Amino acid sequence: MQNFKELGISDNTVQSLESMGFKEPTPIQKDSIPYALQGIDILGQAQTGTGKTGAFGIPLIEKVVGKQGVQSLILAPTRELAMQVAEQLREFSRGQGVQVVTVFGGMPIERQIKALKKGPQIVVGTPGRVIDHLNRRTLKTDGIHTLILDEADEMMNMGFIDDMRFIMDKIPAVQRQTMLFSATMPKAIQALVQQFMKSPKIIKTMNNEMSDPQIEEFYTIVKELEKFDTFTNFLDVHQPELAIVFGRTKRRVDELTSALISKGYKAEGLHGDITQAKRLEVLKKFKNDQINILVATDVAARGLDISGVSHVYNFDIPQDTESYTHRIGRTGRAGKEGIAVTFVNPIEMDYIRQIEDANGRKMSALRPPHRKEVLQAREDDIKEKVENWMSKESESRLKRISTELLNEYNDVDLVAALLQELVEANDEVEVQLTFEKPLSRKGRNGKPSGSRNRNSKRGNPKFDSKSKRSKGYSSKKKSTKKFDRKEKSSGGSRPMKGRTFADHQK
């Protein structure tokens, strides 16, 4: 395996990389860096987490060291990704006098103009704000020799394809080296490549990455009204270190986040209406383990590069294969195992088959956990928490109450009663989620079939026949009967085929 120095990287940059813990290049870095140093256009197909920032960032540092003025422009789909890329570039170039400036919406443009006037070598930004600066002439393009588009398919999905074309047209073509990285290559991106890139060197690592068995993919069949309870049962059994949960709409994210918090889970939500300050706060909590569940829409999660995500839950099934690929790519990184679970209504199974056909691999059916498994998982979790609680000093007033209770009740009965309340506390919390219609059944051409209900209000959960808002559905059980270990499970329903999580662990 070649090291960075053998690829042509300077001692100063190699020293910075080693201080960051990077001893050897990743496959995409090994394949990209030599061509990037030669000024050859690069078309890289790779998912987030493969080291693609280093693939374009490391050689870029080599090219801009000692230069004056804006030498390179990097486009990213989101503010978070722009900030992450900029931070990595600063680390790569530590001590070499390279200035990196970020420009994106949601922040005062005057501050960005002031930073641009200082002549940074590298500008990283989102398409909309970059165009603002181009129109104001606060971003000069005459000295730019390297244009990089990171996660180009995500920018396209967010409606930036025309912005990308506008920006590429503004950078002088004669001296420009273009590097475009994308997890997928839809036709619009291919057209962009054909129009603006010069015989690019194609570097592809996506197929190997996505066939990597580090990510185990499951689906579980569940009706909409039972989805939330099934989901929280999985959370109790899986005990994810960090989990990202995907909802289809902003309302779904808000309601799902509130429901999880009311059940005692450490969760926060992200969607397009969240302010930049709040987004940064939520992401900081997630990265620092203050919360372990992040609920997000596809758009809000784009560009996030968070390590350590153990589970991805598709609470709502994605409408296309590309979204599915990006969702599950948030887990199973850096050699760690990941689990992706997709909740699917019986009439949505066509979407599962479409994803399987497109990716060339099957998902495993996963039966929802039994009540006994859920309670056992909760009990194990409570035992672990009790061990932590016992290591802390209790307040004197609580010790006084404890003494009074122990004098009045048998100690075993007292502890058992308290544990029972802790284990079953979640069951007493009522939550409300607005009913969401399943996706339309797909026809033979892969598109939603039929137009019978296109203009019909039948089945629309939002309004009743008098156009009054529905109250949605509740996850609270109608029966308040306590669970009895000897009680037989309902034999009237046929068990769903597939493995339980306990089977999976075996």
From Swiss-Prot:
- Motif DEAD box — list its residue ranges: 150-153
NADP as UniProt keyword = no
Where is it located?
Answer: Cytoplasm
Entry's PROSITE patterns? DEAD_ATP_HELICASE, HELICASE_ATP_BIND_1, HELICASE_CTER, Q_MOTIF
UniProtKB keywords = ATP-binding, Cytoplasm, Helicase, Hydrolase, Nucleotide-binding, RNA-binding, Stress response
The effect of disrupting this gene, in the record's words, is: In strain S30, cold-sensitive; decreased growth at 30 degrees Celsius, no growth at 20 degrees Celsius. Reduced biofilm formation, increased hemolytic activity, increased stability of mRNAs of the agrBDCA operon. A double agrA-cshA mutation has wild-type biofilm and hemolytic activity (all phenotypes in strain S30).
Residue intervals of the Helicase C-terminal domain: 214-375
Q: Where is this region: Disordered?
A: 436-506
Boundaries of each Helicase ATP-binding domain copy? 33-203
Keyword Mitochondrion recorded: no
User: Main EC class of this protein?
Assistant: hydrolase
Q: Which GO terms describe its cellular component?
A: cytosol
List all Basic residues biased stretches.
468-480
| Pfam families noted in UniProt | DEAD, Helicase_C
- Enzyme Commission number, as recorded: 3.6.4.13
- PANTHER family, alphabetized: DEAD-BOX ATP-DEPENDENT RNA HELICASE 47, MITOCHONDRIAL, DEAD-BOX ATP-DEPENDENT RNA HELICASE CSHA
> What family classification does the UniProt entry report for this protein?
Belongs to the DEAD box helicase family. CshA subfamily.
The extra comment attached to this record reads: All disruption phenotypes were also seen for deletion in strain SA564.
Indicate the quaternary assembly.
Answer: Homodimer. Component of a possible RNA degradosome complex composed of cshA, eno, pfkA, pnp, rnjA, rnjB, rnpA and rny. Interacts specifically with enolase, phosphofructokinase and RNases RnpA and Y.
Which named protein is this?
DEAD-box ATP-dependent RNA helicase CshA
* Species this chain originates from: Staphylococcus aureus (strain NCTC 8325 / PS 47)
Could you tell me the gene encoding this protein? cshA
